[in-house]
Amino acid sequence: EDDIEADHVGFYGISVYQSPGDIGQYTFEFDGDEWFYVDLDKKETVWRLPEFGQLTSFDPQGGLQEIATGKHNLGILTKRSNFTPATNEAPQATVFPKSPVLLGQPNTLICFVDNIFPPVINITWLRNSKSVTDGVYETSFLVNRDHSFHKLSYLTFIPSDDDIYDCKVEHWGLEEPVLKHWEPEIPAPMSELTETVVCALGLSVGLVGIVVGTIFIIQGLRSGGTSRHPGPL
């Protein structure tokens, strides 16, 4: 089939999976960016940014009904077909700051978790080994081309050389929780020996410059003196 070219693309739909507990979601994406999803537990629409909810609205009951219908149909199809349960994949996590880090300046840490399947996961933030809940936001499960998922968790924070952070990932595909560590990279202060060496090198370069400059001046004076001697008549 030929790909359809368009200036903008909106995508909405449900994802349901047979697994212990409720696994399913209803999402809406526009040009590849998530606008909202329906929270199954709270039964409410969760907007990716508060401003999106001011532009339009969505009744979460519509999404919940579609998820319920999808689960019902999935159960029927499962009973009528021979199927092999999908294996649990081990997710991969990466932590990085949203902006260049400056101590004392507000910033956001991003924990990007990829290769998630099935879409059931716990992502938590730790600061100095203690759980952090304030300033935390995460997306719904976003679909990859291979039908696995990825998810992003955000933590707003103020960088300090006293704090270290970890993104903790728990998933059925992992034998134990994975911690992805992050701390601000602060240049180490120079030791006294290093400072002495740097000063000595700077002094040496300066002396060499003075000597070379003096030589050029002397040569210039000699050349000038020679040119002033009168030639033969």
Curated annotation (Swiss-Prot):
PROSITE patterns found in the cross-reference section: IG_LIKE, IG_MHC
SUPFAM superfamilies (UniProt xref): Immunoglobulin, MHC antigen-recognition domain
Residue numbers spanned by region Connecting peptide: 183-195
Extracellular side: 1-195
A single BP term in Gene Ontology: adaptive immune response
InterPro entries in the cross-refs: Ig-like_dom, Ig-like_dom_sf, Ig-like_fold, Ig/MHC_CS, Ig_C1-set, MHC/Immunoglobulin, MHC_I/II-like_Ag-recog, MHC_II_a/b_N
SMART domains linked to this entry: IGc1, MHC_II_alpha
Keywords, in A-Z order: Adaptive immunity, Disulfide bond, Glycoprotein, Immunity, Membrane, MHC II, Transmembrane, Transmembrane helix
Highest rank taxon of the organism: Eukaryota
Region called Alpha-1, residue ranges: 1-88
Glycosylation (residues): 122
All ranges on the Cytoplasmic side of the membrane: 222-233
Cystine pairs: 111-167
Main location: membrane
Family the UniProt entry places it in: Belongs to the MHC class II family.
Record protein name field: H-2 class II histocompatibility antigen, A-F alpha chain
Organism: Mus musculus (Mouse)
Gene this protein is translated from: H2-Aa
